[in-house]
Amino acid sequence: MAKTKGLPKDTAVTPSPHLRPHTADLNRLLAGEHHDPHSILGAHEYDDHTVIRAYRPHATEVAAVVGGERHVFTHLEAGVFAVTLPFTGLIDYRLEVGYDHGGDQPHIHHTADAYRFLPTLGEMDLHLFSEGRHERLWEVLGAHPRTFETPDGVVEGVSFAVWAPNANGVQLIGDFNHWDGNEAQLRVLGSTGVWELFWPDFPVDGLYKFRIHGADGVVSERADPMAFATEVPPQTASRVTTSSYTWNDDAWMTQRAAQNPVFEPMSTLEVHLMSWRPGLSYVELADQLTEYVVEHGFTHVEMLPVAEHPFGGSWGYQVTSYYAPTSRLGTPDEFRYLVDRLHQAGIGVIVDWVPAHFPKDAWALGRFDGTALYEHADPRRGEQLDWGTYVFDFGRAEVRNFLVANALYWLQEFHVDGLRVDAVASMLYLDYSRPEGGWTPNIYGGRENLEAVQFLQEMNATVHKASPGIVTIAEESTSWPGVTRPTNLGGLGFSMKWNMGWMNDTLAFISRDPIHRSYHHHEMTFSMLYAFSENYVLPISHDEVVHGKGTLWGRMPGDDHRKAAGVRQLLAYQWAHPGKQLLFQGQEFGQRAEWSEERGVDWYQLDENSYSGGILRMISDMNGIYTSHRALWSHDTSPEGYSWIDANDSTNNVLSFLRYGDDGSVLACVFNFSGSEHSHYRLGLPHAGTWREVLNTDAADYNGAGIGNYGAVQATDEPWHGRPASAVMVLPPLSALWFEPVAAEAPVVQEPPTAPPLS
């Protein structure tokens, strides 16, 4: 902003013959559909003089202050003003724009001219974007506060850049111009379709949108696809923001880069931030959520999508602002603080990411420039009928760039440790949930979406190279081969995938009355036929506790005592089975009601003497056992880490197996899925000696019946189950027992059971 001493004197000269722009250019400018308004507005030299033009539709007067001299503009028409300066070589100037506010004198606004600044994107940025290879796209598109040193002083403002290649014109609207974009028109840069404008004095925290004059003749007001912050929904404007956050997680980030999460423990609590404890902000969650997951031994938190979404009932899975953490809970820096606090407490952070589809809201990405831009133009590929959403055009370089850069953005700007990619199956198959004749085949006549495959491979290869130690997890519900195979071997390149088969079979089995389970024994053994074909996560996610499916508690047959026993047993089975585990909020203590994003978690169940309290105490203990026993996680992806003891005891409803660690450790796990106690069950073991009972889900501490083995069993050299040794033990009904061998010098503390067996 220019600072003048006293009142600048007015200077008048003979008007230039070039004062008035060509009629066609002027008409396009007035219509808001000029591709290069900078070619008309701003300062332009002609032979021995300079013409400055300004478009200020609501102004009563405009003047340019040059070296202390005030040059008054002539009003040409419809808010277009111009002035002739009798010289060339103009270095700097400021505008004085007068507005009639009803007083004796007009209100004068002093500002730099937006149309005298060079583009804020370089040729290399534009080239990389058009090729789909700009890995830090968020640094060039979107809204960026900038400062320029000029001869007349410092100019502060914000540069705006948006991709809309088929638009006839793009205007910037916001509080700064009372949402009238005529005076703030962007220019297109070359053939890239990127429109750009630097606007002086635009405030950080200011609201804005783009007014797009679409190729279809429709003028629409759009949120910035690259917005880094937004208004709180249901309001839809984008917000200028900048980060001043100082991270304090260097130790975590260094450790992350040196590890492969596939070979590390991962016990994940899945959380919907808005409903975990309704009403909490990011800052409050940083205290309360961190304390909770640390107290109960989880290693990771997985957050349902935090990117901005207009409809809370979508749980975040219909994203409109891919680069903005939801403003419902605070600012982007406050989200950084939440991640930072979790890291400082040793907790990893995974966020759900939704590149498969996006909603059709008229102010968002859909038909952004009047054409199918982000979505595929053919509705047989560009629409997801089940969800009423658009599908990204994965074959378009700029769209792939938008998504790949977005994945990098969350990993690098917010230090998140992983992305759980939603609805991968819907991306991989062209006929996914489509009727016959409602889809088009690929170039080879198949149903595989080759462009989506290429995108997923590119995304995975890029993020793993740029951010070593992060994890990408696919929610992929089919048997697509090689989901977790490296991309250089033809796979999709994910670190892990959800084991939906394990989840479906296990939940079906535990829902049955114990008296019938022996006839469905295969449902619990089948998962081991493919357990090492991919790197798996065992999910009991939000999808399994909504829409009438019930909860873990609700699925269990029997009275409350048996339901609680069943929940404890199931969780112990999940933790012992090869693969990482994920559990949705509330299920860690056996919430009885289905989840509702409007109600949140039923914390009232956590009475110290309740079954829920017992389940949660077991989770806390079990997580501690899990992280301290390498046998439970170091060989999750290898057959070396697993061996059946007996997979075929359907008569007794018992499963048993061994887990091995990369340090030579071993854990014996046995599960009695029947409703009856087995008081003299002989179990084959690798060697004789004392085997400590490290977990008994029926322990009185967990509000179980307290049936057990006095803390340990003695294995003798009697072969059983094909093993050289065996031990006779008590198996409580609906229970899980874990045993580890005890070194001779480590005494076992034996305690009698504290409650009688179930009748």
Swiss-Prot record:
Enzyme class label: transferase
E.C. number: 2.4.1.18
Pathway note: Glycan biosynthesis; glycogen biosynthesis
Region feature Disordered, mapped onto this chain: 1-21
Matching InterPro entries: A-amylase/branching_C (IPR006048), Branching_enzy (IPR037439), GlgB (IPR006407), GlgB_N (IPR054169), GlgB_N_E_set_prok (IPR044143), Glyco_hydro_13_cat_dom (IPR006047), Glyco_hydro_13_N (IPR004193), Glyco_hydro_b (IPR013780)
Reaction catalysed by this enzyme: Transfers a segment of a (1->4)-alpha-D-glucan chain to a primary hydroxy group in a similar glucan chain
Protein keywords: Carbohydrate metabolism, Glycogen biosynthesis, Glycogen metabolism, Glycosyltransferase, Transferase
Pfam family name, one: Alpha-amylase
GO cellular component, as recorded: cytosol
Enzyme active site: D422 (nucleophile), E475 (proton donor)
CDD domains: AmyAc_Glg_BE (cd11322), E_set_GBE_prok_N (cd02855)
GO BP term, pick one: glycogen biosynthetic process
Gene Ontology MF terms in the entry: 1,4-alpha-glucan branching enzyme activity; cation binding; hydrolase activity, hydrolyzing O-glycosyl compounds
Domain of life, per lineage: Bacteria
Stated family: Belongs to the glycosyl hydrolase 13 family. GlgB subfamily.
Function text: Catalyzes the formation of the alpha-1,6-glucosidic linkages in glycogen by scission of a 1,4-alpha-linked oligosaccharide from growing alpha-1,4-glucan chains and the subsequent attachment of the oligosaccharide to the alpha-1,6 position.
Subunit description: Monomer.
Record protein name field: 1,4-alpha-glucan branching enzyme GlgB
Organism of derivation: Mycobacterium sp. (strain JLS)
Taxonomic classification: Bacteria, Bacillati, Actinomycetota, Actinomycetes, Mycobacteriales
Gene: glgB
